[in-house]
Amino acid sequence: ILILISLFSIRTSTVQTYLTQIVANFLSEELNTKIEVKRVSIVNLDEIAFDGVLVKDQKQDTLAYINTIYISINKIIPKNIYDINKINIQGGAFHLFKKNEQHNFQFLKNYFSSNNKKKGEGIETILDELEVSDLEFKYHDYDTPKTPFGIDYKHLHLKNIYIEANRVNLLGDMNKAFIKKLSFHEVLSGFKLKNLTCQAKFSQKGINTRRLTILTEKSKIYAPYFNLSTSSFKDFNHFSEKVIFNGKIFESKVSTHEVSLFAPTLEGMDNDIMLKGEVNDKVNNLKIDNFTLKLGVNSQLQGDFLLPNFKKLNSSYLNERIDYLSLTISDLEQIKLPFTLSKNGKIKIAPILKRLEYINGNNIKLNGFDKQFVISANKLNSKLGSIEMKNGLLFTKKENYYLFEKSTSGEYDIKINDLELGQLIQNKSIGKINGSFQFSGIAKDLNDINFTQLAGNLNEFYFEKYNYKNIFIKEGSIVDKVFTSKIDIKDDNLSLVYDGYIDFNKGNHLVMSIDLSKAILDNLNIGLKKESNLSSNFKLDITGTGYNSINGKIQLAGLVYTENNKSFKLPELTIDISRSEKRD
């Protein structure tokens, strides 16, 4: 009878709780801390539930508290294999920290670690189902200051942790699981993971995933595989420098702000983009292949890229190739850059570039370093025309500007096709141009570019309702909106040699000498009558934006004017001009 009573008593929660408290008290004395379990329920030795589990550290601060732990065991197999049906953890918190090079949980690790196990021997745990809900996790390394931005792996505060996993296998350092759901809120950075599903492996060597889906507040990411390789868990403390990526991403929506939380050097970025591609290597040297990116309303690019180390931009190698580009200026203005590249995070676009409205192109390459690189492109199209840069343009960084130099190919640096130059520079007298150029110059930014050397051929140049052809430019420059050059024109209706400059600041100031050997004025749309021709030597110093708005002086020598087979000759002439739409 006593035996039956004892067996029955053991099956009651009160007795089970009492026996568990004896064990808890023993461990409390052994560990010099407090371990407490408020209630225990055991059914048939294969199901057990613990309520109110409390573990304090050796300074009597709460290390862990769990409301309820439910465990259902299938069987215990010899050779250290535990086969568990289900573990359910409901509510609780873990408060871990490191101070003065000591972790507050180190005493538990020391106590339960086995010093007499053979090398390689361990306990394998097989778990069919794992459910965790309403859990909180804190970790602080008080020996290390907090980072001001992003996820700091030495200072974490996860709330609302929810985990649902199947086929969990734990063996020493290697952990495997099929994660059906994982969600949490990292309070310090603000990052919220709404759901993550995948087949995963976790170990000191990193995280390997298959069939990965990540849903956050701003991102939806789908990847057939995505791996983060490390030499130890400590590498996550230096995520950008030590964690190696290897993954493939199907078309996904990604928040660049959320990316910057994991790579703080990208702080300032805050755009939603659509992308797909393959990624390899570390964040600070990330290689992206077969990449497609869609941004804003109408912009996208396709190509292969090697992202630089933004902390060491001066020494980072650039190897970027855009196979296809379609970019609108309105979308470009919405891009927010890292603060390391722009103090206010914005791209400053010059008004002259805004007039292009869009840029389409293919086979665009950038190769080199921040201090010296080459840009080339098969063709770039815009609303106002197109250019070709097949031979590449060399840029060299100086103290506060970039020096760009003409190529040594002997052909051209830029070929211009049907460019509406007048619309681009907002001059109604000028129309479309076609030609090819070689040049060198200085670029301080997109709003401040000067061409110190310029040479080329203009096949077509539309000016004042006439399309001039065969224009050869040499010894040219465009500095501070002043165009200086020597020009030889061999048009069917105009033949001249020009030497001078045009100042496009405040009303177009022209200072030049011209040796005019032929000008069929009526064909050039500047003659008063038909069959009018002019030849002369000119010196001009005039200001004006067109023929109806000219002021200045013209000096002529050896002038010959022919009209209807009648000639008029004038050895010398000085003309003072003051003309407007209302008066001559």
What positions do the PLM features span?
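Hydrophobic residues on conserved beta-strands that form the core of alpha/beta folds
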Residues: 37, 50, 66, 84, ...
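Residues on the solvent-exposed faces and adjacent turns
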Residues: 39, 52, 73-75, 91, ...
